[in-house]
Amino acid sequence: MGNTVERPIEAVAWMERSLENSVSTVYIDDMKIIGGDWNGMMICWSREGDILWETNLGDRVAGIRLSTDGAMLWCIAGREAIGIDYENGTIKWNIEFDGSTDLIELDGENRAWIVSSVYDIELNDFMESAISLIDSGDIVEKYILDERPWSIHPFEEGKAFFGLGRPKTGVLELTEKKGKLMHKHNSIHDSPVLCGSHLPPFYLGHSNGMITKIDEKGNIMNLELNKKHGSAIIDISSNNEQILICLENKQIICLNKDGEEENSLEVLDSEGHPEFLDIIDGSTSDGLVNFWIVTSTNNGSLLINANRKNESSNIKLKIKANSRIRDIANAKGMTVVGLDDGRIIAIEEKMLTRRIRENEKSDEEGDVQRFEMLERLRKLRE
């Protein structure tokens, strides 16, 4: 892995703000940073760190999406879906569901798909789930199922795919026709879906290490991997060039779009257990494909910055936090991290790259000095 820089998260923070309770979700775009906590408080800052507004949604904020026109934030919190004015934080509408709201993705300009579920504490299992298509404050239609959907993949307006858990597993396809949701179940294999990527073509990770692909035409297929990985895929992320998967056995594997493994990293026991991945949006200042690996440790978490160079993956930086990282998001050269202790840390990519290079230069100078000293000692012994 080469020389790896280690820093406390406070040392690389461009900005630090805080919520009263544990952070449950973070959001960032080219103008604003938003954080939501487990008690429903949501605060919006400018990217310079000035507070713009705050509002209370009453329960754990689980997801934030910005409408395509940039006017409305679509949020889920507790048992509700909520519409919030992007400029001032005013609540415009809300819809209450029978169970907790788990997932949200937009459907065109003024609608969204919502996954909600009812959990039985005594049985320690999900009793029932619902997929709802909403139009602002109204439910257009609802589809009830026994399985818990673990991912939403909007295909076109009025049509989306959902990765299913047990008992049915596979991929559910819902299409709106004349105000009704038509359903089609695609049985891939009996391994439940655990996660899914967010950009088309979509990739779904299964508990047996297999990947399902939904291409740009809506075709569903098993991605033919050139190597089999029996470990569960706990997170998956993709961009235009590659797919990154995080396995339960602590391997991080990079695949090309044909399913061929290009390289891999292994998270060491001392680095904790990997929880999720995040590919850094857009081109970075060093011209490399950069990504974050978030792990949980005995005394907090690690935020690991890695990149791909010359067909190999390398860990460049380990950022230590004494609190668990709950969520991460990035946009336009800035990464935002939400911590269990309520802090929200913003990391500016250019500043971070500069510090890594300064450290590498310092290490190189130190290596030269050590070599020269050893040479002088050797000559003295001659």
Predicted segments with their positions:
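WD40 beta-propeller blade core
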Residues: I43, I82-G83, S132, G170-E173, ...
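Short loop/turn segments that connect beta-strands within beta-propeller blades
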Residues: S46-D50, D85-G89, I134-D138, T175-G179, ...
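Residue position within the beta-strands of beta-propeller blades
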Residues: G35, C75, I114-S116, F161-G163, ...
